[in-house]
A protein has these predicted regions:
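Ubiquitin system architectures
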Residues: 1-82
């Protein structure tokens, strides 16, 4: 498990998430959108394919079919979901 900061510009918030580093980016996007939607009482999960998870630390767009670990994401990294 890794602990990351996730910026979500749609709500203007930064959240801390504990994620399994072996999960794919697709699964991570699904999980964080579901949690944020519950917290914000909104539905951000429509058209999930349009969302991109990016590493602010590594300055790159993460590949949806690869795991967080495969892309070098570690504890204390900063991510942004746009």
């Amino acid at each position: 498990m890794i602990l990351v900061d996730l910026e979500f510009p749609v709500s203007g918030q930064i959240y801390q998430f504990r994620l399994d580093e072996c999960m794919t980016v697709n699964l991570a996007i699904d999980e964080v959108l579901s949690i944020i939607a519950q917290k914000e009482r909104s539905n951000f999960s429509e058209d999930k394919e349009k969302w991109m998870l990016c590493s602010k630390t590594g300055r790159k767009i993460l590949t949806r079919t690869m795991s967080l670990k495969e892309q070098g994401i570690r504890t204390a990294d900063s991510l942004i979901l746009v």
